[in-house]
Amino acid sequence: SWHSKLKIEAEYINTHKSKENTTVEYSRNLEVTDPLYYKVSNRSYLELVPKSSSSATEVDFNIWNTLAATYDVKIVFLPQHLATDKSVAKQCQPNYIRVDMSYLNEGGSKTETVHLVAAKDSVMVDPTRIDTVNVGSITFPVSTYADEVASTKLNLRFAGKSGEKTKSRTFLIDCVILEPAKN
């Protein structure tokens, strides 16, 4: 392809903003003795924890340097055994996610939002392994290359009902990847 892959490291403070009223965020580092040490980019990840048992975990990722092109969007999740809360680690329940993407329209002046994974189509994340989830593809009508402020955002949130006990609300995220779509 004529354009390159974009990789957004989840643990970097400038790459994301969690919803403060529902979500607590932690940047975590893997121990060198962890079997996943060489499989996780930068040996670190973002842990998002709900503020309460009824909170829906939610975060926005800033995405810079998109070109006017089509990308496949992927999110790399880590296994639940890495969760700081040992009850979450022990239960090892899957995440169910919803994903939206917002970006500038063709005129470059207004933000459009697209549901990559809508609520009714929530995607299950495997809690037992590193799971690279392909959440869909998107075509950006304008380039944001070299813009100082990220106008492209990926919104990731828990897709479950309040108080649901069979789905994990704790997200362990390595990175977000936008790969050039293969034609």
Kindly give the residue locations of the regions a language model identified:
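Extracytoplasmic
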Residues: S1-N183
